């Protein structure tokens, strides 16, 4: 139900010639590439504004915990909580959840900025709806609704007694003599466990840019993932205006998914708003509405409805043959990627030669992006501003963003786009931000600059946790040269009884909750089998052959993915403009989430095939 028109297979007659568009793509990429220097070191801003004990974290002291458990789960986000529920379903109650935040919720705990919302249909994104009996209020849930559902899950399964909040794990180490993991924390805890689950999440460790002069700025500044309502007024639910901004000039650096959601609310409440842009996002409208019983009852009647709906969504995006009614189809409405997937599927069915497939796909991609650029022109009144807001790159180079009010915010006289022509801001002064050689005075500066994403980023950098395996080697050292080696993206050789949840080498779709479900199912069944009465083994790890085969499968098609990434402007999808520096092993499982889930089910059905046991 988005405003983007259906995708034709060739560009409209009104489009620029294809060669002109591709040349424009290259020009825009090159100007950003020259100014993009990845930096894995923590900045002064990071130390000052992104600590866990930050503006939204109370001080907390407690006595050290010394205990042995069957399972320790690191992370109380959706992945950690769903895994805990699945463990309970297996009859396993001896587990601890270590969460660095004041509350559980992961991404949704940290990202409490105004306007925070999910752009995946709530019926498939909010986990355990069928089990809790909860029906979402909106088609796309707000952050507040998601956090309330997290609390509902914790209450229903009595997970509160398992959770240790405000606890940063500092190191974990496998003790081969005891077949136990040793876990250390910032509270001097000493925990041991048979199984260690890393559910450390994707979007929680702020990525703060190294901007000269940041320490000189005299105004308030914070990252969007550490929003300070004491400075802005208002609340995470958006129930009251940010009244403290009525007399303030605000600057936002970053126009990715977070920035796009934040800007409309700031535009309403701030006296003046500057939006500093390096690269525009591709913006698609998204219909959100209140869910009525008339809409939801036909969906939720059959047992297993939520899992089935997740599968329907992934089948549509993977363009498989699947008979669907119009009601089923609403699960993926607005997903422009669906059009491109169908183009690919059609070419496969027609046995189009690989050389021709690239050409036809590129034409379809250009057509879609022309529709998105036309949407900008139709929404933004000022022609010059509209031109600067148009994305000039292939569709999936950057995360697509679905938001109705972002583009129209620039029709307000109080909102000004500061496009940096791909260069980013130059520096900060005591009074504000210098961009394009001009100082823009601001009272408040907000960094909507994203997070340290998993792909290509050292585990310690993202989590502040050292993970030592059976030979004393850290996980980062093991993956340093060639990238990750795993089985299913979950099991890691030389790290026995370690179970990892993340996108790397796993099946991934736009709905990451589906990935969490499949991973948690596998993890809980594997642990359950190991803990059965009479089990003859206490530890597992993937065999050399099984892990090598899985890595080889992950690397398949890497050359095509690399070529695509090299055509994109810098961003976290392509290693900030250096995709050749990221080994192919960091990729997702290329055969899709259904094939990934089937491979794990086959492993379990065949007596944990591919796993060594002792």
UniProtKB/Swiss-Prot annotation:
Q: What happens when the gene is disrupted?
A: Abolishes the production of penifulvin A and leads to the accumulation of gamma-lactone-2-keto[5.5.5.5]fenestran.
List required co-factors.
FAD
Q: Which superkingdom?
A: Eukaryota
Q: Does the keyword Aminoacyl-tRNA synthetase apply?
A: no
The UniProt keyword set, sorted, is: FAD, Flavoprotein, Monooxygenase, NADP, Oxidoreductase
Q: In which pathway does it act?
A: Secondary metabolite biosynthesis; terpenoid biosynthesis
Which function does this protein serve? Baeyer-Villiger monooxygenase; part of the gene cluster that mediates the biosynthesis of penifulvin A, a potent insecticidal sesquiterpene that features a [5.5.5.6]dioxafenestrane ring. Within the pathway, peniC is responsible for the final regioselective Baeyer-Villiger oxidation of gamma-lactone-2-keto[5.5.5.5]fenestran between C1 and C2 to form the delta-lactone moiety of penifulvin A. The first step of the pathway is performed by the sesquiterpene cyclase peniA that generates the angular triquinane scaffold silphinene via cyclization of the linear farnesyl pyrophosphate (FPP).
Query: What family name appears in the similarity comment?
Result: Belongs to the FAD-binding monooxygenase family.
Q: What is this protein called?
A: Baeyer-Villiger monooxygenase peniC
Report the source organism: Penicillium patulum
